[in-house]
Amino acid sequence: LILCYIPTNLCNLKCEYCLVSQVDGWHERKDIEFKYPIEHMIKAFSKERLGGECFINLTAQGETLLYKDIVALTKGLLEEGHSVEIITNATVTKRLDEILSFPEELLTNLFFKCSYHYEQIKDKKIEGIYWSNVKKIKESPCSFTIELMPYDKIASSIPDLCERCKKNAGAVCHATVGRDDATNGKNLLTKMSKDEYVNTWSVLKSDMFKLKMDLFGKKRKEFCYAGAWSLLVDLSSGEASQCYGRMNTQNIFKNLNKPIQFRPVGYSCMQPFCFNGHAHIAWGMIPEYNSPSYYNVRN
């Protein structure tokens, strides 16, 4: 599992629960400097260097499809033989169409996580664009999922958002869990009690939501293989860490002849809980934890 972080803030939506849109210049194209060209990055992620085929997640701080080199990067990773996941709000049609024009043998290894920003798009022109693009993906050889960010303001709209999902995508969306990163304990991003929050959003019957709430606020003390079986890589520099909650420990772009160090977190996790467990525990980073598979939390 390779988690690629693209540190670009540019986004075309302004969501009140998102930290990116709270900073000045969030909607302006101010591309940061990427130290290495795409061709170099692809070589850094070669199957030989990584030890085989990997599942590679591409996530920008803003909208991933607005990263200027996302098409070339995605194609290069697929051609290398990896499976690729793109996190997107599914509204950047031009880039999406370019990607969907790839050969079928590449698209079968491509997965889109389409974030459903219900309040920001409902009954607006952009909602038509969103569902049109979701349908394009559905009709392609790619895989996809719809994921909602649940928050208090839209709790009363659950029946409506479920109906829109069923009508346009064929199934009710999954749900993630919002957290308040301004708090040391990464508290739930809600004014509800935990029980009320769970009862409210469990109606979606999302395995993603259930797993994240099962993990929420519970310190993991088992041996964790993140770092041995996964990496988090900053694509602007090549700096890499074992997971989201660790400091960078190596640069995997600087010297392509230098072996990548795969060292597990083990018993030394310092986080209050595994806040992105769907991206680690669902992939088996803690083998003794009886987790649903990544397939289940995304299907």
Per-segment meaning from a language model:
Residues 1-21, 55-59, 230, 234, ...:
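N-terminal pre-triad scaffold of radical SAM enzymes
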Residues 109-111, 122-212:
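Conserved C-terminal portion of the radical SAM core fold
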Residues 45-49, 78, 99-109, 131-139, ...:
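Acidic (Asp/Glu)-rich catalytic clusters
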Residues 2, 22-35, 52-66, 80-95, ...:
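Core AdoMet radical
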